[in-house]
């Protein structure tokens, strides 16, 4: 093979690899990881033991495609503000690694594929819930709430709670009080998880007129709201104990993890009211660790003999 041909092949290979990486980035894989953390444990709880491993794998694949579709639509819709905000400068529609058309077609393809896949691999209730999650995230949160109200993440966060319902429905074919409580745990957890991040990137959101709570209210007000939602999350997590018959492992995780999460929110608020330097990302990272610990306990508890 001559040098010119080899060079062209190398460029094409690099181009394909970079394009593939851009498509993956469009789905926001780090967000998807957190969503999947809640899915598999709920399936174990719904089964009261290990479900069929192929069902778990199939639902996780479907959930990945579904969340990826919603995130890709979000990137397409928000491409105008992503070009202005510093923290989104490396997204593929900003860098030009993907065209607008490529992103939109990709979002549609994996979205439709996720619905069909979940319907075939599990049941059509799970598929319908997945469709509802995509539609809610795209139309209610991204197109309606995000740029209009500081409560955007409160109500828009409902889309991120859907994986627990999807996981439960995939196993049982219905919805009961236990998954509703799990839904509410994630719903109440979302604001104190996301608001600290918006405090760090307050200037970014202000530059594009997105009315995040950190933009329209002071640090102390945001800190107080974070405390209230963290306490509500802890209280809601304890409701699962009598409703789903959770055992010692879950109870300890809910109390210890929830207590730590609440402590970090109080610490953030105390620094804010004293006008001292704050570290909102401590709460952000603590919230991720807390939710992961809690749902790990959700999955472990049904497998134990006590």
UniProtKB/Swiss-Prot annotation:
Q: Where in the cell is it found?
A: Cell membrane
What's a GO cellular component annotated to this UniProt protein? plasma membrane
Segments passing through the bilayer: 31-50, 55-77, 104-124, 125-145, 168-188, 218-235, 238-258, 286-306
The UniProt entry's sequence similarity note says: Belongs to the UbiA prenyltransferase family. Protoheme IX farnesyltransferase subfamily.
Main localization, broad class: membrane
One annotated GO biological process: heme O biosynthetic process
Pfam families found in the cross-reference section: UbiA
Topology relative to the membrane: Multi-pass membrane protein
Enumerate the catalysed reactions: heme b + (2E,6E)-farnesyl diphosphate + H2O = Fe(II)-heme o + diphosphate
From the Swiss-Prot or TrEMBL record, give the protein name. Protoheme IX farnesyltransferase
According to its UniProt record, the EC number is 2.5.1.141
One further remark on this entry is: Carbon 2 of the heme B porphyrin ring is defined according to the Fischer nomenclature.
């Amino acid at each position: 093979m001559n040098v010119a041909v080899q060079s062209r092949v190398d460029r094409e290979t690099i181009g394909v690899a970079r394009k593939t990486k851009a498509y993956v980035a469009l789905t926001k894989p780090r967000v998807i990881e957190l969503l999947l953390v809640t899915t598999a444990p709920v399936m174990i709880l719904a089964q009261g033991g290990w479900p069929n491993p192929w069902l778990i794998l199939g639902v996780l694949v479907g959930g990945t495609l579904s969340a990826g579709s919603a995130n890709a639509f979000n990137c397409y819709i928000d491409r105008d503000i992503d070009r202005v905000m510093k923290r989104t400068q490396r997204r593929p529609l900003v860098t030009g690694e993907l065209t607008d058309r490529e992103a939109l077609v990709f979002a549609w393809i994996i979205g439709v594929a996720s619905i069909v896949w979940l319907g075939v691999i599990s049941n059509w209730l799970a598929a319908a819930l997945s469709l509802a999650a995509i539609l809610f995230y795209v139309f209610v949160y991204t197109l309606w709430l995000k740029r209009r109200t500081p409560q955007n993440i409160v109500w828009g966060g409902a889309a991120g709670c859907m994986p627990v319902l999807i996981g439960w429905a995939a196993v049982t074919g219905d919805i009961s009080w236990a998954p509703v409580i799990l839904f509410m745990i994630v719903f109440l957890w979302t604001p104190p998880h996301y608001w600290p991040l918006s405090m760090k990137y307050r200037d970014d959101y202000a530059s594009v007129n997105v009315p995040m709570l950190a933009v329209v209210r002071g640090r102390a007000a945001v800190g107080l709201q974070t405390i209230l939602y963290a306490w509500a999350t802890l209280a809601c997590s304890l409701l699962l104990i009598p409703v789903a018959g959770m055992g010692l492992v879950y109870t300890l995780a809910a109390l210890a993890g929830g207590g730590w999460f609440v402590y970090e929110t109080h610490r953030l608020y105390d620094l804010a009211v004293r006008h001292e330097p704050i570290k909102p990302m401590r709460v952000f990272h603590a919230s991720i660790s807390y939710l992961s610990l809690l749902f790990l306990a959700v999955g472990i508890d049904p497998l134990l003999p006590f």
